[in-house]
Design a protein with these regions (language model features):
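Domain-edge interaction signal
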Residues: 2-6, 12-15, 26-189
Length: 189
């Protein structure tokens, strides 16, 4: 009986935590025209603004957008860019940027373009050297809807460290499906 009670308590705790996380993610998105959301029932209907503008940004621009928020490791920037791409495809029905394909590497989802750009930095934190110029460039590259997606991704995942984001991506279907048949440390590229 105690075991059943503990399992129910754990289930309720996890359900509550997931509801709060989902609520935070949805409420941080201001690109929705209409939203019916019930916290307890977790039912949601949303009408999303679809963006028909051509993609101007490259995946390295997405990385720069996040780096304006603060210095971070190559691993963390990879994961944030992955989530920006996933959220953009889901909410806007378009890529967040060009060259936005991700592969399931041992340490999570990795974009080959970003990997090539930042490979030489090793474990050093990446940073923006010219903030004003980068900020001006970002204003020209991203639509207001894309900025809302980027802000929502930052608000949801920005506080996590690189290892936490890696662990999170390892629990999600895109990584799991691409890693099917590969050993834990076997290269997929």
């Amino acid at each position: 009986m105690r075991f059943v009670k503990k399992v129910k308590n754990m289930k309720n705790m996890i359900s509550s935590w997931l509801n709060r996380l989902l609520y935070k993610a949805i409420m941080s998105l201001k690109i929705m025209d209409h939203l019916d959301f019930q916290m307890e029932g977790c039912s949601m209907t949303a009408k999303i603004a679809i963006v028909d503008k051509p993609i101007k940004a490259d995946i390295t621009d997405v990385a720069d957008w996040f780096l304006l928020k603060g210095n971070m490791s190559n691993k963390k920037i990879q994961k944030l860019c992955y989530y920006a791409q996933a959220w953009s495809l889901t909410l806007l029905d378009q890529d967040i940027a060009s060259h936005s394909e991700f592969e399931a590497w041992v340490h999570g989802l990795v974009n080959r373009t970003l990997y090539q750009v930042y490979d030489g930095y090793g474990w050093q934190e990446l940073k923006i050297t010219n903030r004003e110029e980068t900020m001006a460039r970002m204003e020209k590259l991203f639509t207001p809807e894309q900025v809302e997606v980027l802000e929502a991704v930052w608000d949801t995942y920005g506080e996590y460290g690189a290892d936490q984001l890696e662990a999170l991506t390892h629990t999600e279907l895109p990584w799991l499906e691409q890693r099917t048949g590969l050993g834990k440390f076997e290269s997929s590229h």
